[in-house]
Amino acid sequence: MSRIVYLDNNATTQMAPEVIEAVAQVESSVFGNASSMHTFGRRAGALVEDARLKVAQLLECETSEITFTSGASEANNTIFMIAKSLIEKRGSGRIVTSAVEHPSIIETVKYLKSIGIHVDLAPVGKDGRVIMSELEKLMGPDVVLTSIMTGNNETGAIMDIATISQMAHKCGSLMHTDATQAIGKIKVSCKEWNLDYLSCSGHKFYGPKGVGVLVAKKGVPFMPFVHGGEQEHGRRAGTYNTAAIYGLGIAAKLAMDGLEQENKMLWAMRERLREGIVKAIPNVVVNGSQEHCLTGTLDVSF
């Protein structure tokens, strides 16, 4: 009987056992609406805030800067719609992003272009990383938002977000990174990178599907994408998915505690796979940067 090996963790990871246990426990025993003021609601609300603290520690930001969403796609759309609103209010402005972003950004860019918003795409080199000299040429005082992913989901290329953030702020632009693929593989720091916005999804680091995070630095522009109730201080309406959010918090704690060990294991497995493929298949090309690469990603062509 043949053995099936799962090699699609950049699409989604299996929930960690600790996360599965936590989600199941909350689903079976904590059913109150986290926005309600009664005992059942406060109990659910406490779990949401526990998760918020863990996520803030993982991303090195303030708890007040975190907005829970349905995932990175929603967070990315929210951030780009904020930029759209700013450009429309000013009557001018541009967005700068890269040509290799996740579809939730690329497709949003297509929409924005269709309604007249100016968006420039920075190219990447053979190593899959944004060409910094080309990005710098695109920067200027009219750039409202610069958005570059932390790590690419196909090549694994890691971008120099700290330097790009400096470049963006130098010309007065807001800075966003989609860190979805990087969480749990490299240290991600909103404070060290001086980010205005960050987005990520729980299911890419052993957390539940359908839950994500939007970090918005205190004082930066924010316009809700989902309107309705006053959840998340009016930033994102909708009844809290308490179990998924709590599970996200558990996954965040696991990512913090196991970062070094996880990376060693992933890199060893990646190298074993790479060596096996190169040995078995002639003329294989390993794509992307091998120096600046997410440990769990291998991209080859033959």
Predicted region positions:
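Pyridoxal 5′-phosphate
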Residues: 1-302
